[in-house]
Amino acid sequence: MAQQVSARQPRYKRILLKLSGEALMGSEEFGIDPKVLDRMALEIGQLVGIGVQVGLVIGGGNLFRGAALSAAGMDRVTGDHMGMLATVMNGLAMRDALERSNIPALVMSAISMVGVTDHYDRRKAMRHLNGGEVVIFSAGTGNPFFTTDSAACLRAIEIDADVVLKATKVDGVYTADPFKDPNAEKFERLTYDEVLDRKLGVMDLTAICLCRDQNMPLRVFNMNKPGALLNIVVGGAEGTLIEEG
């Protein structure tokens, strides 16, 4: 059973949570920190416990970074395919952590991997979400040259999610990198066009344009802040909200 946590009514019925692969590293320099997996599983379980349907996309940067190898001469398509496989590995690890917490979960891959994951099917994904399972979308869009941010926005639109929640290391979008610039100011709210015009680097151009064209709200928040994810889902004002003006 998913953990029962709050009597507050959720603001969102269905969300798409985007985690970076680097987030799974925790304090490690590479790979997956089991403690981080367990903490994330607990926070996701809190959402399931109040009836929120959760779709999940995880990057692969903790296991493989194709851009560096591409710059060194590796074929870009080959590198992107390797990156897709890294996201599948992260998805399997997250499914295991969720199931150990008695939270039902399903991994779907945009690349067919019979016997390892289910192949991505929109209608099947929505049936499992309606049944209370966490659905983990892996292997990006299945196409090279598309980021996992683009995959997250695409899947959110396909499954008719209410919002995309992008978990980062900082509590929102700033005028500059707050780790490098102490005078950086945080935005409470932005429009898609402001993100594009200011070149804020929240997500890649394709992802932002997808959200803008389909009017999909996007909230950027700090996943390392305890309770932030639950607070957003019940209507709290964590991070930065990006939506149509």
UniProtKB/Swiss-Prot annotation:
Its EC number is 2.7.4.22. Keywords: ATP-binding, Cytoplasm, Kinase, Nucleotide-binding, Pyrimidine biosynthesis, Transferase. Pfam families: AA_kinase (PF00696). It catalyses: UMP + ATP = UDP + ADP. It comes from the Bacteria. Pathway: Pyrimidine metabolism; CTP biosynthesis via de novo pathway; UDP from UMP (UMPK route): step 1/1. GO terms for biological process: 'de novo' CTP biosynthetic process; UDP biosynthetic process. It is found in: Cytoplasm. Inhibited by UTP. One of its GO terms (cellular component) is cytosol. ATP binds at K18, L19, S20, G21, G61, R65, T168, Y174, D177. Belongs to the UMP kinase family. PANTHER family: URIDYLATE KINASE, URIDYLATE KINASE PUMPKIN, CHLOROPLASTIC. Catalyzes the reversible phosphorylation of UMP to UDP. Homohexamer. This is Uridylate kinase. The lineage of its organism: Bacteria, Pseudomonadati, Pseudomonadota, Gammaproteobacteria, Pseudomonadales.
